[in-house]
A protein has these predicted regions:
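Basic, Lys/Arg-enriched alpha-helical interface segments
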Residues: 1-72, 81-85, 92-128
Length: 128
């Protein structure tokens, strides 16, 4: 039996969706890279694709989906209970290394999502 995962996008408190915004810009500027990244996100639904060359662990629970085109296109994500993948940040860069500030943005968004997710669960428990 193949284990499938749901892929979700992080949203800010204000309702902005940075990964969707990143993908929308990519669709206009580099349609081929956009198509490859969207196909990669779809492949992440299959557990067998959670490793290289499509995906790579970065530490602290974060992973990257990577597409090499004119520039390296990366989407950072993490696992969540219930077979969920949460995509938190997307970047394009020329180098192989991930800039520290981009990793920090991805980590902050992951921690923000986790904080809000667990606060919501606590609200439901207290209502029971």
């Amino acid at each position: 039996m193949v284990m499938t995962f749901a892929v979700e996008f992080y949203e800010t408190d204000a309702g902005a969706c940075p990964v969707r915004e990143f993908l929308d810009k990519l669709k206009v500027s580099v349609p081929d890279d956009f198509a490859a990244v969207v196909a990669g996100l779809a492949k992440l639904r299959n557990r067998q694709c959670h490793r290289e060359p499509l995906s790579k662990p970065l530490g602290d629970g974060l992973f990257e989906l990577r597409h090499v085109g004119k520039l390296n296109t990366r989407v950072f994500w993490f696992f969540m209970k219930g077979q969920r993948i949460i995509a938190v940040h997307g970047i394009r860069n020329k180098g192989r290394a991930i800039p520290a500030h981009e990793m920090e943005t991805a980590r902050k968004r992951m921690h923000d999502w986790l904080r809000r997710e667990f606060n919501e669960k606590d609200k439901f428990r207290s209502l029971s």
